A protein has these predicted regions:
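Enzymes that bind and transform nitrogen-containing heteroaromatic metabolites
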Residues: 2-20, 25-27, 43, 83, ...
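Solvent-exposed, charged/polar functional surfaces in cytosolic regulatory/catalytic domains
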Residues: 16-19, 61, 140
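Proteins enriched for Cys/Gly/acidic motifs involved in redox and nucleic-acid/cofactor modification
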Residues: 22-26, 115, 129-159
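N-terminal glycine-rich anion-binding loops that anchor highly charged ligand groups
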Residues: 23-39
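Extracytoplasmic/periplasmic beta-strand context in beta-sandwich domains
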Residues: 28-32, 69, 205
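Short, compositionally biased "basic patch" segments
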Residues: 32-33, 57-62, 148-151, 155-157, ...
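Zn2+-dependent cytidine deaminase-like catalytic core
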Residues: 34-133, 219, 239, 244, ...
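Active-site beta-strand termini and strand-to-loop segments that position acidic
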Residues: 36, 146-147, 363-365
Length: 365
């Protein structure tokens, strides 16, 4: 079905798709290679929503050389008119003879229709080449479409003994400069960075990408059930990225000062029995806003709530070679004796040394 050249061309397409990992949201990351055998005549990737898709960039580069070629694309070509014309039509018009997709597009607007349109035009189509890699690349987009909620990554940083601060609350950078720079990359890949009102009041964070230039800043989401976010905080006064204030408050007079800021969006959500934002109810709301990949950067209470509720899909833990002793713990979870005699619900995906700190990535089994 697929030979070594097919595999190499799709690997090239996936590498191209990764170039858009900081900018395509809410669209998927897609790369395309057009080739005659091992000779590449055109290639491209989707850069930003509203701009040409990967196939169009590749076809423009290939020109007349696209005729009779094979197009390798990491996601099924679209078949509908959105902010851009259908890529399937562009491929048909180019004269390519074969299209290989890493995976079909689960978006109901496409969902096999793109490949069907190509086949109806006499173009041979195949799919499933390096599908696992393609799905991993678009885990956020796929989570939003298939599960109706974002992929949730929880970022943590702690000392070797699992502490985030001293007992009196004093804290500074737990991890080193290299690890903090790596966090900037995770932020840039995310559609949004989510935190709680406790972190806003204690630290007044910006939660934006500062380490390198990027075409878009991730949105910022603050869970603030009682509407306590100070109007002078960076979340409100800094308009570098859109900010969503999630609250249960329904008093328009209290909401009015926040609505005066163009980059602020008020999202009404329900509370749970503890008087905090109901996370399970919130995630589908965030998916409706187009957020597919969310990174949680919060204190122990909110971080623990995502993990305990089963809503965290990935944990990224940065652990520093420091021992704080008595202090504030990374998590506040109830005892779970079952894990002593079982494998647990998390599995290690990677362990990496970044500077002097260890980065540990875990995924839900």
């Amino acid at each position: 079905m697929f030979d070594c050249i097919d595999t190499q061309m799709m690997q090239n397409a996936l590498a191209l798709a990764r170039l858009g990992r900081f900018s395509t949201s809410p669209n998927p990351r897609v790369g395309c290679v057009i080739a005659h055998g091992s000779q590449i005549v055109g290639q491209g990737f989707h850069v930003k929503a509203g701009e040409p898709h990967a196939e169009v960039h590749a076809l423009r580069q290939a020109g007349e050389m696209a005729r009779g070629a094979t197009a390798y694309v990491t996601l099924e070509p679209c078949s509908h008119y959105g902010r851009t014309p259908p890529c399937a039509e562009a491929l048909i018009g180019s004269g390519v003879s074969r299209v290989v997709a890493a995976m079909t597009d689960p978006n109901p607007l496409v969902a096999g229709k793109g490949l069907a349109m190509l086949e109806a035009a006499g173009i041979r189509t195949e799919s499933g080449l390096l599908e696992t890699e393609a799905r991993e690349l678009n885990r956020g987009f796929l989570s939003r479409i298939e599960r109706g909620r974002p992929f949730v990554r929880v970022k943590c940083a702690a000392s070797l003994d699992g502490k985030t601060a001293l007992a009196d609350g004093r804290s500074y950078w737990i991890t080193g400069e290299a690890a903090r720079a790596d966090v900037q990359t995770l932020r840039a890949e995310s559609c949004a960075v989510l935190t709680g009102i406790g972190t806003v009041l204690a630290d007044n964070p910006r939660l934006n990408v500062r380490a390198f230039p990027t075409l878009r800043q991730p949105a910022r989401i603050v869970l603030d059930s009682k509407l306590q976010t100070p109007l002078g905080s960076h979340m409100i006064s800094d308009d570098l990225s859109p900010t969503v204030i999630v609250t249960a408050v329904d008093d328009e007079e209290r909401l009015k000062p926040y609505r005066a800021f163009n980059h602020i969006r008020i999202l009404r959500s329900s509370e749970n029995a503890a008087g905090r934002i109901d996370l399970a109810a919130l995630l589908p709301q965030l998916a409706e806003l187009g957020y597919g990949e969310i990174m949680v950067e919060a204190g122990a209470t909110l971080t623990s709530a995502f993990i305990e509720s089963g809503l965290a899909d990935e944990i990224v833990l940065y652990q520093a070679p420091k021992i704080l002793g008595e202090g504030r713990s990374l998590l506040t979870l109830p005892a779970n004796p079952a894990v002593l005699t079982s494998e647990g619900e998390w599995e290690s995906r990677s362990v990496e040394l970044i500077g002097q700190d260890v980065k540990w990535v875990l995924r839900k089994k």
